[in-house]
Amino acid sequence: CIRDRDKLFGSYGVYAADPFHESAPPIDTPEYLTGVGQTIHKLFQTFDAGALWVMQAWSMREDIVKAVPKESLLILDLNGSKTAANGGWGYPVIAGNLHNFGGRINMHGDLALLASNQYQKAKARYPNVCGSGLFMEAIEQNPVYYELAFEMPNHADSIPLQAWLAAYAERRYGAKSAAAGKAWMYLLEGPYRRGTNGTERSSIVAARPALNVKKSGPNAGLGIPYEPMLVIRAQSQLLKDADKLAFSKPYRFDIVDVQRQMMTNLGQLVHKKAAEAFASKDKAAFALHSGRFLELLRDMDELLYTRSEYSFDRWLMEARSWGETKEEKDLMERDATSLVTIWGADGDPRIFDYSWREWAGLINGYYLPRWQKFYTMLQGHLDAGTDYQEEGLSLAYGREDFRANDFYNRLAEWELAYVDQTGKARTPVTHGDELVVTRRLFDKYLKLSREYYADFSGVGEIKEERTYENVGEE
């Protein structure tokens, strides 16, 4: 295998290997693990005398690491947690941030932590820290986070964050706007507040339906870890200077993103009201709140349809472009669909929705029908005067299992059929004007927000103990 690589690419000095990544070794003894480290090191050195082994710290083991000379190993500490725990045992370490899992779409990220200059702090504590890195699983979300993170290694100390954000807004939008600067202060107090690094919160939109929705993906759960009106105030400020800033493509991206966050946050409370109405057997209230929730999903799809960055249709068309024959193109579409839905090839996946995305096309074609089927099922129970019980169902990573009961089994068959369906992409991949659609939906959901947030009490201390989660260890 390594010789075949040499024929294709030649030797290039740097080689990656992560033994037992997110898994357990067959023999977990110091002697065995030391042997693993020595064997891999010898393989690399035999192939390339100057080889540098690059290893992720995610699942690294001390005995494997210490079997390799320090000059022959570079550790990538994806989220900085291992460096904080053991200093990398004196080995060269790149200490970084793992800000996004699976390409999930959610505004978050501890900007104050970045502005404090993590690299310089880590370097001062551990001289073996030799670099800073970003190890996100996907991009095209939270551009402010990445802009600041990539800038910080150029600074010798911390920076004044509020001043940086004001300059960022002007630089990003290409014009001075006090309102835009104020908007970013609200966002700093809200989704970019302290403690919001690591795993993004779940999405009610992308969650597999349940009365008590716990998670969308297999990691962090639902919840809004800040006062949700802060996002609404930010959007109000961004729209104030729309006539001045509408020429700016980054501005148009941001107003869509903030509107998306405003609506997905609100969706958590709307569905909660629908679930409460079902529990109390209030048919009128159930119809009102479930109807509003489904309408919110349709509106989100329309909103996100205005930007190619939020286009499932673009994703599918680009995937199909890699195929030469119809069979290859269909396979590429199936795999691209599977990645953002069931996350696997079998009929009973456990890490389904790992890579959920709030995307146009995926909402309209996948998430919305799931919720429609669920609410229709609940309505049937209301009409028949029967109960629907979720308590005691088998769970997979804190959510109802893929086939936890009859409803989920039927839903699973529909989901698997959706993955196999071809020709799903809509053309063109975008439709509508971002500013026109955003303004209309802001006015519409501002009114509903005032109603649903009237008694909101969901903001509390952010719990950090599950900030980073390894889905390989349940």
Question: What role is predicted for each listed range?
Answer:
Residues 248, 252-301, 396, 400-403:
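Ordered core of a single globular domain
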Residues 105, 141, 239-247:
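N-proximal short alpha-helices
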Residues 166, 185, 232-236, 261, ...:
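Feature representing long, continuous alpha-helical segments
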Residues 223-245:
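Polar/charged low-complexity regulatory segments
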Residues 3-201, 205-226, 232, 279-294, ...:
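Catalytic-core regions of glycoside hydrolase
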